Amino acid sequence: MGAYKYLEELQRKKQSDVLRFLQRVRVWEYRQKNVIHRAARPTRPDKARRLGYKAKQGFVIYRVRVRRGNRKRPVPKGATYGKPTNQGVNELKYQRSLRATAEERVGRRAANLRVLNSYWVNQDSTYKYFEVILVDPQHKAIRRDARYNWICDPVHKHREARGLTATGKKSRGINKGHKFNNTKAGRRKTWKRQNTLSLWRYRK
């Protein structure tokens, strides 16, 4: 087994003594740092490489913490001015994952970079910590790499804000196979197509 396989097995057993100790030390370290900060190297190199990271120029890792829990509706004094069914303020569940939120915040901070992917690294009672893989679209090492230069195209600006990263697509229910027939073109698009009566007019 290669070194990365051992790292992978360590991560699978998150309740093991080794990993519990490591995570406790690391989470203390992360709490002392800024909400969004650049990491020198990935905490989980095996996971980062599986998601497309390469230890070469043009690739950057940012670590970010996101507060856990529900999303409170931003209304003044809790006044929603609606029917009782829509008056909820506190117990509403955000429809996107915290990982998607983390990607979006990092994407706003490093607006000149492109978000490639992200992964979970740690959590405590208050926060979840993620590492986001970013790519510099202006760097020659990226522009000349046939595997990665697709992300230099302008249509990939702020992929994370439009639900085009892996976690964004998961939130949108977009994937392949028979389980995803009802979200193939998007949940709302499919609903509209299936609930719109279209009567074709034929002339003889």
Swiss-Prot record:
Q: What does the record give as the function of this protein?
A: Component of the ribosome, a large ribonucleoprotein complex responsible for the synthesis of proteins in the cell. The small ribosomal subunit (SSU) binds messenger RNAs (mRNAs) and translates the encoded message by selecting cognate aminoacyl-transfer RNA (tRNA) molecules. The large subunit (LSU) contains the ribosomal catalytic site termed the peptidyl transferase center (PTC), which catalyzes the formation of peptide bonds, thereby polymerizing the amino acids delivered by tRNAs into a polypeptide chain.
* Gene Ontology BP term (one): cytoplasmic translation
Keywords tagged on the record = Cytoplasm, Ribonucleoprotein, Ribosomal protein
What are the record's GO terms for cellular component? Answer: cytosol; cytosolic large ribosomal subunit
| Listed NCBIfam families | PRK04243.1
- The coding gene here is RPL15A
User: What other note does the entry give for this protein?
Assistant: There are 2 genes for eL15 in yeast.
Instruction: Give start-end positions of Basic residues composition bias.
Output: 169-185
Query: What is the designated name of this protein?
Result: Large ribosomal subunit protein eL15A
Report which superkingdom the organism of origin falls in: Eukaryota
Q: Which cell locations does it reside in?
A: Cytoplasm
Q: Which GO terms describe its molecular function?
A: RNA binding; structural constituent of ribosome
Q: Which species is the source of this protein?
A: Saccharomyces cerevisiae (strain ATCC 204508 / S288c)
> What PROSITE patterns does the annotation carry?
RIBOSOMAL_L15E (PS01194)
Q: Which Gene3D superfamilies match?
A: Ribosomal protein l15e
> Region Disordered: which residues?
164-185
State the family it belongs to.
Answer: Belongs to the eukaryotic ribosomal protein eL15 family.
- Main subcellular location: cytoplasm
InterPro entries on file: Rbsml_eL15_core_dom_sf, Ribosomal_eL15, Ribosomal_eL15_CS, Ribosomal_uL23/eL15/eS24_sf
| Upper lineage | Eukaryota, Fungi, Dikarya, Ascomycota, Saccharomycotina
